[in-house]
């Protein structure tokens, strides 16, 4: 039996809809873009992805709480530099930065962008003697990933200019160039730059940020109007007189209704003043549901329970027993992995096995 033209059009429309959805996921604004020759690989489609990630981390309350607590849990109750690496115990550079400070800085970059960078300075014997955490947003890799390009002012959109340094692990020590940069980018297999731990919830982070802006605008502008005040026979009123009338209405309205009205200036003679209430819609409820869903997705992407950042769970509140259970699971499956990553990096740079220990995080509600 032949399909009708209407059926064919419906099928075609559905297929096109599916294709449109698929196309949204073919193009990735976070995708690396390779330059010509041995040029800089753009971090994101326009080389400005780090700025977006940093802005999100600073403006999303939920994401910031997750990042801050992730750093705390990964840092444990402190850093111990073992005897074999005693030269790093007091400080790691001439500025007096401690090993704890260094690790805190690179973890902040890691949880924000998924990457971090450390400048390593050598003595004439090729031994590392100073470590400086770099702002990873100001670093880029070349196509072969063996050079780190650093721009102390940061990269502009499509910008590629910067100082080139040998990347740690990709070049032998050169006495003429006593500086290398250790650039961590995960396994670096699928993409040049690692993905932020929360990247799967990027849309949700932006939703929360825009939701906060919407709330601010609503408060600043008195929320939506709840009443229409129709004033008849106003054809001869001047704008100044209308302003006086509006101010008079505000003076007589009180509480939350003081600014929640619209005035309709009618021309009908003999008609009495009329006040009508605008029927409320479900926008606030839907808005709240969207914000709550966004928060939940951010926690999911960070693989954290809201309890771990001190947020009460809906319908259950805050329970110390549930918190301890959530922490034990998070520590065993997530935090220890981050700690192993950090210890491996420090071992690699210092050339000392088990150079540091991270004191287990202790929790007491006494």
Q: What label would you give each PLM region?
A:
Residues 349-350:
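His/Asp/Glu-rich mid-to-C-terminal helical/loop segments that flank catalytic regions of hydrolases
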Residues 189-345, 356-360, 366:
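A contiguous, surface-oriented mixed alpha/beta subdomain in the mid-to-C-terminal portion of proteins
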């Amino acid at each position: 039996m032949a399909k009708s033209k209407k059926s064919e059009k419906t099928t075609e429309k559905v297929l096109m809809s599916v294709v449109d959805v698929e196309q949204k996921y073919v193009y990735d604004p976070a995708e690396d873009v390779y330059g010509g020759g041995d040029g800089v690989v753009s971090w994101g489609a326009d080389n400005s992805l780090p700025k977006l990630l940093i802005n999100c981390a600073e403006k999303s309350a939920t994401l910031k709480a997750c990042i801050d607590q992730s750093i705390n849990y990964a840092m444990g109750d402190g850093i111990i530099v073992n005897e074999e690496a005693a030269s790093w115990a007091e400080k790691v550079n001439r500025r007096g930065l401690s090993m704890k400070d260094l690790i805190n800085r690179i973890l902040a970059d890691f949880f924000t962008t998924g990457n971090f960078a450390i400048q390593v300075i050598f003595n004439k014997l090729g031994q590392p003697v100073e470590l400086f955490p770099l702002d990873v947003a100001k670093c880029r890799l070349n196509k072969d990933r063996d050079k780190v390009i650093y721009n102390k002012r940061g990269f502009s959109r499509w910008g590629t200019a910067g100082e080139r340094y040998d990347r740690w692990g990709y070049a032998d020590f050169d006495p003429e160039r006593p500086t290398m940069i250790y650039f961590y980018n995960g396994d670096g297999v699928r993409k040049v730059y690692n993905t932020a731990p929360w990247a799967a919830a990027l849309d949700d982070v932006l939703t929360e940020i825009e939701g906060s802006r919407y709330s601010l605008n609503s408060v600043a502008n008195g929320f939506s109007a709840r009443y229409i005040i129709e004033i008849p026979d106003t054809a001869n009123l001047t704008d100044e007189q209308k302003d006086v009338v509006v101010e008079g209405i505000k003076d007589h309205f009180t509480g939350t209704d003081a600014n929640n009205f619209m005035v309709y200036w009618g021309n009908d003679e003999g008609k009495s003043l009329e006040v009508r209430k605008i029927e409320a819609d479900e926008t606030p409820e839907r808005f709240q549901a969207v914000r709550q869903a966004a928060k939940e997705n951010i926690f999911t992407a960070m693989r954290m329970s809201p309890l771990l950042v001190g947020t009460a769970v809906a319908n259950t509140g805050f329970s110390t027993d549930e918190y301890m259970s959530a922490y034990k699971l998070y520590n065993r499956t997530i935090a220890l992995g981050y700690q192993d990553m950090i210890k491996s990096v420090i071992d690699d740079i210092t050339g000392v096995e088990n150079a540091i220990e991270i004191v287990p995080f202790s929790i007491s509600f006494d």
